[in-house]
Amino acid sequence: MAIDENKQKALAAALGQIEKQFGKGSIMRLGEDRSMDVETISTGSLSLDIALGAGGLPMGRIVEIYGPESSGKTTLTLQVIAAAQREGKTCAFIDAEHALDPIYAKKLGVDIDNLLCSQPDTGEQALEICDALTRSGAVDVIIVDSVAALTPKAEIEGEIGDSHMGLAARMMSQAMRKLAGNLKNANTLLIFINQIRMKIGVMFGNPETTTGGNALKFYASVRLDIRRIGAVKDGDVVVGSETRVKVVKNKIAAPFKQAEFQILYGEGININGELVDLGVKHKLIEKAGAWYSYNGDKIGQGKANASNYLKENPAIAAELDKKLREMLLNGGNGEQPVAAATAEFADGVDETNEEF
């Protein structure tokens, strides 16, 4: 239905006034003068990139990664940093837990010489540092480890045992309101690592919840629930963890998908193992008995040997990665995809939250 001429003139005048007062681009038609594609950064896991539906985590947004202890939360964020640094991006790590291991980070491919790191004294200080880095426009990825360790100043200055109901939740709520717009303008990805707590007295449903109040849940474009589901063994020796990640919330593609991969101790995500599994599943790699073949050439007997072959031949691994992304992600470039994986509803953290 056409808008009459007087309304069009009035609208044009209003738009002109808004742009004059607030700057060009402050208001626009959704399909005009802007890219609708979402720029993403790889998570370091091909199956998780596919499950996210956009080829990775979205720039300019807030992401929450939560799970039990030793489930791989920090490892996953370090893999994101390594992937971002390979693209020439600047990254920062806000270590509120004071537990970052630079030797481990280096093993995962992180350039620790160019990684900005802060160990703030209070939660307010950590969030102000995040805001300052974002407003600089020079930092592409910021990791906060973790929300549970963002202790309000009043709690630190008080006595142990003092009641500080809702302080952390209010602090996070104020920070989200301030950060969300700045992150979008600077096209900076902000990832919060969070811990799980148990709600007391829950008889039915999931008693798990995350710390820091409800604000982060609402402002996050992506929420990932990461869990350790088994052990990776070399003989009788445990060498890693079988890990499952559920996409509990996703504003950039369909949610509720999940990915499974291995995290090897001292190495990080076993991307070559993922390539073998996905290659077999989508018939790019042939499997006859225990032997794996690619383009007619045998690459190994058993998954471990096939993975080692890809590790020793990065050009073939890159070719296989590219083919899988083109096959499984729409757009063919691995950056603006819709996942082809089967949707599975997550039984993730309950949306009701309490302050701990």
From Swiss-Prot:
UniProt KW keywords: ATP-binding, Cytoplasm, DNA damage, DNA recombination, DNA repair, DNA-binding, Nucleotide-binding, SOS response
Coiled coil: none
Localization: Cytoplasm
Family annotation (InterPro entries): AAA+_ATPase (IPR003593), DNA_recomb/repair_RecA (IPR013765), DNA_recomb/repair_RecA_CS (IPR020584), P-loop_NTPase (IPR027417), RecA-like_C (IPR049261), RecA-like_N (IPR049428), RecA_ATP-bd (IPR020588), RecA_C_sf (IPR023400)
GO molecular function annotation: ATP binding; ATP hydrolysis activity; ATP-dependent DNA damage sensor activity; damaged DNA binding; single-stranded DNA binding
SUPFAM superfamilies membership: P-loop containing nucleoside triphosphate hydrolases, RecA protein, C-terminal domain
Listed name of the protein: Protein RecA
Species this protein is from: Yersinia pseudotuberculosis serotype O:1b (strain IP 31758)
Gene responsible for this protein: recA
